[in-house]
Amino acid sequence: MAQQTPLYEQHTLCGARMVDFHGWMMPLHYGSQIDEHHAVRTDAGMFDVSHMTIVDLRGSRTREFLRYLLANDVAKLTKSGKALYSGMLNASGGVIDDLIVYYFTEDFFRLVVNSATREKDLSWITQHAEPFGIEITVRDDLSMIAVQGPNAQAKAATLFNDAQRQAVEGMKPFFGVQAGDLFIATTGYTGEAGYEIALPNEKAADFWRALVEAGVKPCGLGARDTLRLEAGMNLYGQEMDETISPLAANMGWTIAWEPADRDFIGREALEAQREHGTEKLVGLVMTEKGVLRNELPVRFTDAQGNQHEGIITSGTFSPTLGYSIALARVPEGIGETAIVQIRNREMPVKVTKPVFVRNGKAVA
């Protein structure tokens, strides 16, 4: 039977259509996915993300451990509360998960990992942490609410006490701070400003209701997916998995190659892939009628006249832009246009960078 987050009852009271999402009963929408999408782009919306897993790591060798575990380098984290996005790779360079790591003190870091990969993530982390003497605490006592949109921070701040408002004042993106019983982070999955707020399970329902009263619109998985796709953000299991290199998933920027003597899991495989070349992730735009969908083939002819085929990893109609967009994994050599096979029709598409909307505006 699927698990329920501490906010399950609030979702049903708000009229949510609930679905099983990787073993969790989660809201798909509360009546209109499109309205929820636009609320985040123009005002403020919120998502229950309590199904994600918060993992606290403690021990004198925690930084050393994470420099080995992750492709990005936590040596970059020197200011308390600073966060970093990274892939956690296997020995062949495939992506076990993508995650966020927060630095608090030399012996205290926090990871936030995906729900779909929870068990394998915890097994992998535990296995590799043992030689470093790391104490691992899974924070199942915490719920998490993502408040996103141009007015999200201001509306959320009406629920904060003076000390909490002071703690987040001027906080830059990709930071987190523990302020009273709230862990408030300037992170998100929508391409908008906002907070991801972790708080004790028993306080989550009251906080959710207070956000509703403050004018924050409840949003479901449907809007979360169209928002993240417009923002060009990867979804685990679609843009990347254990068989796909981060180099083929527009995650090359998350790999810290320097210093050259840092050994991290998957490094040797990645160096070989970098030398020989990999597929790459691109954006696709189709302004003609129709919708680009996952797993549709993408065909193009390179400059030498050779024909190639890639695949759409995520596709949707973009509510913000008013036409269809997609992310696609394709061989090297793609130009400015390609063809997507939709049923029996060959549809022309424009090839773009893999990001379409940021802060409510189209990315040229």
Curated annotation (Swiss-Prot):
SUPFAM superfamilies noted in UniProt: Aminomethyltransferase beta-barrel domain, Folate-binding domain
GO CC terms, sorted: cytosol; glycine cleavage complex
**GO biological process, alphabetically ordered:** glycine decarboxylation via glycine cleavage system
A Pfam family: GCV_T
Q: What is its EC number?
A: 2.1.2.10
Catalytic activity of the protein: N(6)-[(R)-S(8)-aminomethyldihydrolipoyl]-L-lysyl-[protein] + (6S)-5,6,7,8-tetrahydrofolate = N(6)-[(R)-dihydrolipoyl]-L-lysyl-[protein] + (6R)-5,10-methylene-5,6,7,8-tetrahydrofolate + NH4(+)
Q: Which InterPro entries match?
A: GCS_T, GCS_T_bac, GCST_C, GCV_T_N, GcvT/YgfZ/DmdA, GcvT/YgfZ_C, TrmE/GcvT_dom1
Q: Which UniProt keywords apply?
A: Aminotransferase, Transferase
Top enzyme class, one word, equals transferase
Question: What GO MF terms are annotated?
Answer: aminomethyltransferase activity; transaminase activity
Q: Which NCBIfam families match?
A: gcvT, PRK00389.1
Q: Which family does it belong to?
A: Belongs to the GcvT family.
Describe the protein's quaternary organization and the partners it interacts with. Answer: The glycine cleavage system is composed of four proteins: P, T, L and H.
HAMAP family attached to this UniProt entry: GcvT (MF_00259)
Its biological purpose = The glycine cleavage system catalyzes the degradation of glycine.
Q: Spell out the PANTHER family in the cross-references.
A: AMINOMETHYLTRANSFERASE, AMINOMETHYLTRANSFERASE, MITOCHONDRIAL
> What's the protein name?
Aminomethyltransferase
Per the UniProt entry, what species is this protein from, by scientific name?
Escherichia coli (strain SMS-3-5 / SECEC)
